[in-house]
Amino acid sequence: MRYVFKNFTWKNWLCIFAIFCFTLIQVYFTMEIINTVGEITNATNSGTTTDIWRWGFWMIICAICMAIAQIIIQFFASGTAASIATNLRRDFYKKVNDFALSDLAGFSTESLITRSTNDIQNIHMAFIYAFRTIFVAPITMVWSIIKLVKTASTPMTLTTIIWLVLLIAVVVVLMILVMPRFNKTQKLMDALNVSSRENLTGVRVVRAFNAESYQEDKFEVVNAKYTKLMIFVGKAIALFTPFIMFVMMGLTLSLLWVVSFIINGQDISAARPFFLSSTSFVMLATQIVMSFVLLITIMILWPRACVCARRIKEVMNHSIAVNDPKESVDFTEKGTIEFKNVGFAYPGSEKEAVSNISFKVNQGETIAFIGATGSGKTTIINMIPRFADATSGEVLVNGVNVKNVKQETLRNVIGYTPQRGFLFKGNIRENIAFSNPNLTLKEIQEAAKIAEADSFVSAKSEQYESAVAQGGTNFSGGQKQRLCIARSVAKKPEILIFDDSFSALDYKTDKIVRANIKNGLPGTTRVIIAQRVGTIMDADQIVVLDKGQMVGLGKHEDLIHNCPVYQEIALSQLTAEELGLKKGGK
C-alpha cells in the first residue's frame, strides 16, 4: 500500500486535509449533542420549560451542522478515492502498454485484467471507507475518553473496558482466520478468469470435440475452491455484525445494571444526579465502542486492499525489457534493415533461440524467411520493431541501431501484419485507418484494393462502416488477413513486415496481393515470413532457417540448388518439374 500512498497528488493530500478539518467539526457537534442530552436531562430535574426548549433547539442546530459536515466528508472521500483509483488504472494501463513480449509472458492476460479491474476496485472501496472513518474513529474515541475522565466512575469504566477487551479478542481471532485467505481469493479470481476466457475463446474447438462437460468440470474445480473460500470469509465477516450489536447492547445493559447497583438503597434526591449523569456516560461509552468498531472494520478491509496493492505494485515495479534510449538519434538511411551477427535468448534460457544471423536489405527490396516450425522466423522479425531486443549482435534499421532510437520513432516507419490477424471492435474504416484516423475514404479504399479487400467490403450494405466484432470474429480467416494487410498498407510505411500473413489466402489471391503491394508501394521494403515456397519465390533474398541457425541466404534460383534444407521444403510442396529441377533434385 506504500506504493499507492507515494503516488498521491497534492490535490489528494489537500482533500484529505479537508476531510480531517470537517471531521473535527463533525465530532465537535456529535459531542455537543451528547452534552445537550445531559443538559436536557438536568433541566427536566431542576430547570424550566424554557431551558428544555433552548437546549432542544441547540441540539437541532448541532444535528444539522453534524449532517452537513458528514455530507462534505462523504463528498471529499468519494472524490479522492475515485481520483486515486483513476490514476492507478491509468498508470497501470500505460505501464502494460510499454511491456515487451517477454514482459507480458511473466503475467497472464487474465491476471493483468483482474489487477486492472477487480484489484483496483478493491483499493477504491477500501479508500472510500477509510477516508470516511480513519479520522472520525480516533478523534471520537479520544474526545469521548477525555469527557469520560471528567465523569469517571470506576465500576462503569471497568465494565466498558471488559467489553472492549472482549471485542478486541474476537477481532484478533477473526483477522487471524480471514487475512491469509485474501491473497488466495485474488489468485483464485485469476484462475477463474483463465478458465472462463479459455472456454470462450476456444468455444469452436470445445464444441467440435464435444468437450463441454470436460470444460465445465475444469471450471467447476476452480469455482468450487473459490466459492468455498469466499463462503468461509463471508461467514466470518457476517458473524461480526451481530457480534457488534451484541457488544453494544451488552455494554448498555451492563452499564445500566452497574448504575442501578450503585444507586440501589440510596435516597432518591441523592441518586438522581448520578443517574442523570450516567446517561451521558452510557452515550460516551457507546461512542468509544463504535469508534473501535469503525477502526476494526478498516482493519478487516485493509488487508485485502493491501494484497491488491501488492499485485498492482508487482506490475508497476516490473523492469521493462525494452526501453527507450536517453538520447535518441536520427535515421541516416531509408527503408534499410541490417542484422550483424544477431543472437537472441529468451529470459531464463541459457541457449540462444537464434544465433549468428547476418543479412542486409536495401530500400524497396523483399526479404523472405522460411524454415520449419520453431526455427526462429518470428523471433528474428520481432527484433526489427523492438518487440524484443537482441541479446548479441546489432539490429540496424535505416542505418541506426534500433536500441538508439525511440520505439515510437522506429515503429512509425514500420507496418506490421501479425501471424494471427486481429481486428478491433468498431467498423472496417476505423480498423484500416488505425494508424491515422484522419485518412480519407479514398485512401482507405486504395489500401483495401491493394489488399484485395475492397471487393467483399463494397458488397456489404454499409461497406466501410460495417461493424467489426472484437477480434474480427464476424469475418473469415482470409477476409481478416486481408483487412489486416490493408491496415498496414494504409500506413504507407518505409518497411512492411508480414508474419505469415498470407497463409489464409488462396494461391491466386496471395500472388495478386503481393504484386499489388510491390506495384502500389514501390519504395517500401518488404519482410515476409511464409511456409509456402510459392509465396517467397520472387523475393530478392531468402533466409533459410533451421533450429535457430541461418543455413541459407540468396535467391530462390540459387537456394533450390545449393541449400538442402530449402530444397527439402520446396520439394515437399512442389514437384521437381515445377521447381525447374532435373530428375533427382539436381
Per-range role (PLM):
Residues 96, 219, 339-341:
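Conserved catalytic Walker-motif region of ABC-type ATPase nucleotide-binding domains
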Residues 331-586:
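ABC-type nucleotide-binding domain
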Residues 10-11, 101-102, 118-127, 131, ...:
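An intracellular "coupling" helix at the cytosolic face of ABC transporter transmembrane type-1 domains
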Residues 47-48, 143, 147-165, 175, ...:
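Helix-loop-helix
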Residues 92, 96, 206, 312, ...:
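Helix-loop junctions and hydrophobic alpha-helical segments within the transmembrane domains
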Residues 29-45, 53, 62-109, 113, ...:
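Juxtamembrane helix-loop junctions of ABC transporter transmembrane domains
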Residues 1-30, 38-39, 43-59, 73-77, ...:
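Membrane-integrated ABC transporters
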Residues 11-28, 32, 129-185, 256-268:
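Transmembrane helices of ABC transporter permease
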